[in-house]
Amino acid sequence: MMSYLHSAAKVRAGRVTLGLIASGCLVLGVVALFHANSAQPAMAFLPVVRGGDSAGQVPSDKAKITAAEVLARFPKEKHEEFMRRAIANSRKAGVEYKTGGAFGAVIVTRDGDVIADGFNHVIAQNDPTWHGEMHAIRQACALLKKPKLEGCILYTSSEPCPMCLATAYWAGLDGIVYGATVADSKKYGNFDDEFIYAQFAQPIEDRAISEQTMLRPEAVEVWKEYADRADKIDY
């Protein structure tokens, strides 16, 4: 998707910071995991930062939706109801239908309406991108007939992988509430998301998958044609 990814990532207990920068545009901003007194809470929260510059900083004219603001939208019981629905979806994937790993998700609007359910179909569809969060996001966008989900919250049974987290940014979600951590999914399912985060921190030449650019001028010509389109839709 991108010929160059310049990123910085730190993986520590209780905190993950990931930045992906391509062609000077922020793809994924700063992410903080909130923990109380170093104890694992019943639900953890990922605030999604909208916008940013090439250094990963949030510009002054962009609003950050905080954990407190999102969690204050509904009573604790409603948040737990949405999370239990996401967990039930994870059971469909990993135990009942056996379509993939035990990952499930739901998308909830600002008004508290569930507009999409999703669960992992990687094995059933032979599709490495068919994660529970991706399934839910695709269905929500299809329902709303737009590629953005501002005002919505993603509830997911497990802490999102780098792909799903990046997609949450592209979709413009207000926040993510998750159940199990990446450490849990690694311990019980052998899903090593931390390896991918660590790869982003490595220089391009040291990564497990090589990257190089080719025929850039020809590729840029198409971008110029796209830029000249009067009817293009920015997203």
Where are these regions (language model features)?
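A short, polar/charged loop-to-alpha-helix boundary motif
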Residues: 122-135
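Short beta-strand scaffold segments in enzyme catalytic cores
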Residues: 103-109
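Immediate flanking context of iron-sulfur cluster ligation sites
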Residues: 146-158
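Zinc-dependent deaminase
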Residues: 3-96, 167-235
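Conserved redox-active cysteine motifs that mediate thiol-disulfide chemistry
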Residues: 158-166, 170
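Short, flexible loop/turn motifs enriched in small residues
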Residues: 96-102
